[in-house]
Structure formats: structure tokens, C-alpha cells
Amino acid sequence: MGKDTIADIITSIRNADMNRKGTIQIGSTNITENIVQILLREGFIDNVRKHRERNKYFLVLTLRHRRNRKGPHRTILNLRRISRPGLRIYSNYQQIPRILGGMGIVILSTSRGIMTDREARLEGIGGEILCYIW
């Protein structure tokens, strides 16, 4: 775990998804809770619960896997960190990129909190582009 908590979340979810793990545990901060709520609302994860262990809070995520005859396969195809501590990427609401023609989502940090690209376009606000999920 480094200083970039958003990159840590993305890496943990990507690694658990590739290894077909059912649950993962990540550190709980305000930013991570907001991003996880967006992932839950958009249907990329099944369940979230807050776990306390020796005065530290963790989020336990249950990933969504579809079953087929050969076993479970992954649902989340790609996660990509865009804005990072060394290079911040900002966009106004007209220039927020559309991922796969609107099939994917862009998570933004705006003045009104962390939200998806659709919500930011509806409210007419831009912000820092945190990550793409498609």
C-alpha cells in the first residue's frame, strides 16, 4: 500500500478479478468509500461492508462474477487510473471523455464530491478525472 489510495483500490480490484477471488479487503477512507459506492451503484461489485480491526476500518468488497459451465468468469474488464499525484488531469463537463460510447464510466472528483461522468454532465460541472472503468 502506497500513498495513492485510488491506485491501490484499482490494483486490488484488478488483481482479485484476474485471480477470481470473491472478496477483497481495502483500507477505508472518505475517497475510497465514495468510489466503492459508485462501483456498487453501477453494478461492478455485489456487496460492501465496513470492518473494524484494532482501531482501523476496512471495506470488504464482494466482487461480481457471472457463472458459466466452466466456472465463474470476471465481470470487470478494465480499470485504469488517469489522474495521479505526479500528473493531475482536469476536464470541464463538455470535454469529459465517453468510454466505449457510454458503456464504460469515468469517475471524477468534483467540487460537489466524487461522481460519475453522467452525473457530472447532468449537473454541468467538471473536475479531476480519477479513473476509467470499462
UniProtKB/Swiss-Prot annotation:
Disulfide bonds, paired cysteine numbers: none
Primary location recorded for the protein, binned into one broad class: plastid
Gene Ontology CC, one term: ribonucleoprotein complex
Leader peptide range in chain numbering: none
GO molecular function terms noted in the UniProt entry: rRNA binding; structural constituent of ribosome
Entry's localization field: Plastid, Chloroplast
Keywords: Chloroplast, Plastid, Ribonucleoprotein, Ribosomal protein, RNA-binding, rRNA-binding
GO BP: translation
PANTHER family: 40S RIBOSOMAL PROTEIN S15A
Function (record text): One of the primary rRNA binding proteins, it binds directly to 16S rRNA central domain where it helps coordinate assembly of the platform of the 30S subunit.
Protein family (similarity comment): Belongs to the universal ribosomal protein uS8 family.
Record text on subunit structure and interactions: Part of the 30S ribosomal subunit.
Protein name: Small ribosomal subunit protein uS8c
